[in-house]
Amino acid sequence: FSLLRERKTILIYLLVAGIGGFVYAQFNYLLPLNMGALYGAEGAEIFGVMTSVNALVVILATPVVTTFFGRIRDVRKILLGETLIVVGLFCYRFVQGIIPLYFVLMTVFTIGEVFNTIGVQPYVTRRIPSTHWGRMNSIISIASGAFSGVGNLLIGKLVDTSGFDSAWLVIGIAGIFLILCAAAMCITDKKYFPLLYEKSTPGGTPEAFSDSEPESSASGSDK
């Protein structure tokens, strides 16, 4: 916990991981429920094709994103990824019954998934000492799992009582808050990890920084 006090922007990231886990979970929870309500048994077939599109876009987009967006800092990849995930999911609220747009939004969602995936792990390893990687990854997994688990229960009850439109609205509100948290993480990151911004390398990463203290903490100890 002393590590988190010294690197307060990591606390914001834990919030991003938690809310992001809740929003992302709707891909396998609220979305198939909605497809089933709209199309009955055929909804499972449509959702199956959507997941196939998801897998195909992951295969095609990952090398493209890695090659052409490699110099974007990991924290900005997370912001971009979470934004695309939110847009790709929440917009299903507005395209009910327009099947071709389902696949357009799934493509947007999946590209966001790719950006987020290639940004998250480097973000953690470059800002946390290697001695704490295991513990931090456990905390992140717990936060994400707790938010998604409790969130799915609440979304399920909301669907039963108020319908899918209200459930998607909650996802949209949570998504906006998620994007704001990710933006705040981008803003505060340079304050707590200035050394990461000193060299113009892919991801902005000086060597072996993950085992050092944030410059703001070090400068405070010299006074």
Locate each region found by the language model.
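Pair of pore-lining "gating" transmembrane helices in MFS-fold secondary transporters
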Residues: 7-26, 107
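Helix-to-loop junctions at the C-terminal end of transmembrane segments
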Residues: 60-74, 159-160
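Juxtamembrane intracellular "pre-TM" segments in multi-pass secondary transporters
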Residues: 1-13, 203-215, 220-222
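Short amphipathic helix-loop junctions that connect adjacent transmembrane helices
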Residues: 29-46
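A late C-terminal transmembrane helix in Major Facilitator Superfamily
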Residues: 127-162
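Intracellular juxtamembrane helix-capping segments at the cytosolic ends
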Residues: 115-128
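A membrane-interface helix-boundary motif in multi-pass transporters
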Residues: 157-176
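Structural signature of the two symmetry-related core transmembrane helices
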Residues: 76-91
